[in-house]
């Protein structure tokens, strides 16, 4: 089990990215949360197996579709945390 913080930059607000991240997390057995940031980025705390996290990130980097654009993804290891779902926050 591993936990990461993911900062996603680009055109990722107002394009369904948080919903896309939640759906993708659920499909890859990832728990945690996603939130819009004031600088226009999206922050994700994600926890799961190493292979599930790799698969999750590879889908996230593509974005939800035509109206979104992912320019940069920064991933940082963080301590494991307690949750059993993947939530959309503010």
From Swiss-Prot:
What is an example of a GO molecular function annotated in this UniProt entry?
A: acylphosphatase activity
Q: Which UniProt keywords apply?
A: Hydrolase
Tell me which InterPro entries the record gives: Acylphosphatase, Acylphosphatase-like_dom, Acylphosphatase-like_dom_sf, Acylphosphatase_CS
Which residue intervals define the domain Acylphosphatase-like in the entry? 3-90
What EC class is this?
Answer: hydrolase
Its gene is acyP
Q: Which reaction is this enzyme known to catalyze?
A: an acyl phosphate + H2O = a carboxylate + phosphate + H(+)
Identify the species of origin.
Leuconostoc mesenteroides subsp. mesenteroides (strain ATCC 8293 / DSM 20343 / BCRC 11652 / CCM 1803 / JCM 6124 / NCDO 523 / NBRC 100496 / NCIMB 8023 / NCTC 12954 / NRRL B-1118 / 37Y)
A Pfam family assignment? Acylphosphatase
The protein in question is named Acylphosphatase
Give the E.C. number(s).
3.6.1.7
Q: Does the keyword tRNA processing apply?
A: no
Please report which protein family the annotation says this sequence is part of.
Belongs to the acylphosphatase family.
Q: Where is the active site?
A: 18, 36
